[in-house]
Design a protein with these regions (language model features):
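Conserved, structured core segments of small domains
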Residues: 1-116
């Protein structure tokens, strides 16, 4: 089994627009999304290594200093799968795609021997 970093992405502007919706509309959408997540987890949850988290506000650090920025990362997971293609297949019908313009990036997680 190989480890992969999964990034659940959506344009920041889409999320900002979603937050402007009436709270009852958002809550209904959240209930639908949770049901989709529960179903997906039932079928594919064994891939997850136990690390899934939402991404908070971004502080970018460069050689020139640090600043607050917006990016499109909503959440991340660490998963195990036989291959990157197998991981991609499992995520093809993920409920994250209920978010307009949402996408999922899956990349190999290479452990750096001196960093672990």
């Amino acid at each position: 089994m190989q480890k992969f970093l999964v990034l659940y992405m959506a344009p920041a502007r889409v999320l900002e627009e979603w937050m402007k919706l009436d709270e009852s509309v958002r809550k209904n959408q959240e209930v639908e999304m949770k049901a989709g997540w529960d179903a997906w987890m039932q079928a594919n949850g064994s891939m997850l290594t136990g690390m899934t988290a939402g991404a908070g506000k971004t502080r970018r650090v460069t050689s020139a200093g640090a600043e607050d920025v917006k990016n499109d990362v909503m959440m991340f997971s660490i998963i195990e799968a036989e291959s990157q293609d197998a991981a991609a297949t499992a995520f093809q019908n993920h409920p994250h795609f209920g978010i307009p313009e949402g996408w999922i990036d899956i990349m190999p997680a290479h452990v750096l021997s001196r960093m672990s």
